[in-house]
Amino acid sequence: VAAISAGGAGAVFWMWVTAIIGSSTAFIEATLAQLYKEKDPLYGGYRGGPAYYIHAYVEEKQKKKRNKVVISVLFAISGLLCWCGISQVISNSVVSSFKNAFSIPPIYMTVVLVAVAAVIVLRKDATVKILDMVVPVMAVCYFVITILIIVMNLGSLPGVFARIFEEAFGFRQAAAGGFGAVLMNGIKRGLFSNEAGSGSAPCAAAAAECDQPVKAGLVQALGGFVGTTVVCSRTAFIMLLAPEEKVTGLSGMDLLQTAMEHHLGRFGVIFIAATLFLFSFSTFLGILFYARCNVAYLFGDNWASQIAYKVLALVMLFIGGLAAYTFVWDLGDVGIGLMTIFNIIILYPQGEKALKELKEYEKEKRK
């Protein structure tokens, strides 16, 4: 949604390119996260991610133990900034969708969203069990509905692909100085959707129970690719299959819900609002999961810092519900850009280890 809002149809193509190229970086960073994971004394299980494998790499190069490594610290701070920004995006999307569907004032919906999120975060056992049951059902419903819409409009699909490729390389965008915006927004939103190279996903990959580090890498490479090329593409097609005169000038949830209203009537608007509301909590929990290992790296193993970040994330959730659509992306864009820079710096020299693990894994498979 954000890619098309800011960069038009051509941004979808660059999201695909990001997904294809990003699969290799996703494999390397997830494998490294498994190689350098460590026990988590607070939550149990394992933790890890770029802050940890960067730290290990510097210690190996300098051949001495370090309490903190500058690049690891910078990555962890950038990650926390990014995830605070994503918290704003979550609430902004939900609040906008409910305003469109039910005319609920943003302040009321923001308060409800933050209150429910606080219950889930601070006392989550029962609510998480409910989400575990409901969210997969909604995901299947969204998948089926979007596929049905695409099938119903199969005749228009070639025109959509033509528009995507034309605007990705079009002379019109280049002449208007818009090609850079198309490319930039496609890559930025591609990074948010597949996370490849940014260092977010390895925080989760480190916690996985794997007998071979490579397995986490392969799963991550496939997951990021499918997430962008299949899941995000379906949403893009829904918007691009709507008549241009109906969606011109719209952005964010206004764009998506107007497109859904064209395809499914009022039901489409309400369906998007309900789906986003449920998905927002699982996404928010995912963000906090990513954040906790970086908070631990920065401030040590203590509950005070963990709770403080959760409270900060709830505050950002509140701010995002009331802020302008373009504003809420800014903090996330800055954070993910810095994360990617610090992560890629280390992925290049460390990539050999991941590739070595892959070769050994392939040898075992051939036996």
Which role does the model predict for each range below?
Residues 9, 83-95, 117-130, 148-160, ...:
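Transmembrane helix-loop junctions in multi-pass membrane proteins
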Residues 18-46, 55-92, 96-120, 274-285, ...:
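Helix-loop-helix module between adjacent transmembrane segments
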Residues 8-16, 56, 60-73, 110, ...:
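Membrane-interface alpha-helices at helix entry/exit sites of multi-pass transporters
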Residues 4-44, 226-234, 333-346:
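Extracellular loop-to-transmembrane helix junctions
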Residues 2-3, 7-11, 26-66, 245-264, ...:
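Flexible loop linkers connecting adjacent transmembrane helices
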Residues 71, 75, 79, 92-98, ...:
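Membrane-interface loop-to-helix entry segments
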Residues 29-35, 41, 147-163, 177, ...:
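Extracellular/periplasmic helix-exit of transmembrane alpha-helices
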Residues 21-29, 109-124, 135-155, 188-191, ...:
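Selective recognition of specific alpha-helical transmembrane segments in multi-pass small-molecule
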